Regions:
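A detector for short, charged/polar N-terminal pre-domain segments
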Residues: 1-3, 73-74
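DNA major-groove recognition helix of helix-turn-helix/homeodomain DNA-binding modules
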Residues: 27, 46-61
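Interfacial/linker helices and their anchor residues that mediate assembly or domain coupling
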Residues: 68-109
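Short amphipathic helical patch at the helix-1/turn junction of helix-turn-helix
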Residues: 2, 13-14, 42
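Short alpha-helical DNA-recognition segment
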Residues: 16-35, 50
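Recognition helix of helix-turn-helix/homeodomain-like DNA-binding domains
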Residues: 27-43, 64-65
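Short basic helix-loop element that most often maps to the first helix and adjoining turn
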Residues: 6-25, 84-85
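Residues that mark the N-terminal boundary/hinge immediately upstream of a DNA-recognition element
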Residues: 7, 18, 44-47, 58
Length: 109
């Protein structure tokens, strides 16, 4: 699978489009988009240009030669949120454990 195929999938998901929606906007079928994303076929230059336009990226970004700042910022925020969620889950487990201890203590009285 080429970087273009990976990036089509990455940017499509980032924009919240289904394969069918992207395909419709660029004049290709859902199956064609699916085949690209799985690396079974490569998009031609016209399809790449159309996908860039719909997905709001430059050809340099699609080919991986340049980073996409909006995408990078989004995933940095997602990473921070995931870390915070893990911390909250650990705190929740500690609270659950403490509550279980209190319940046991109260029931033993």
């Amino acid at each position: 699978m080429t970087i273009v195929c990976e990036n089509i999938k990455k940017f499509r998901k980032f924009r919240g489009l289904s394969q069918a929606e992207l395909g419709e906007k660029i004049g290709r079928s859902k199956n064609v988009v699916s085949n690209w994303e799985r690396g079974e076929n490569e998009p031609d230059l016209d399809a790449i240009a159309a996908a860039c336009k719909v997905l709001g990226v430059t050809p340099n970004q699609m080919f991986g030669w340049e980073r996409h700042p909006e995408y990078d910022a989004f995933y940095k925020r997602m990473f921070v949120y995931e870390q915070k969620m893990k911390e909250l889950e650990e705190k929740r487990k500690a609270i659950d454990s403490e509550l279980a201890s209190i319940r046991k203590m109260l029931s033993d009285q």
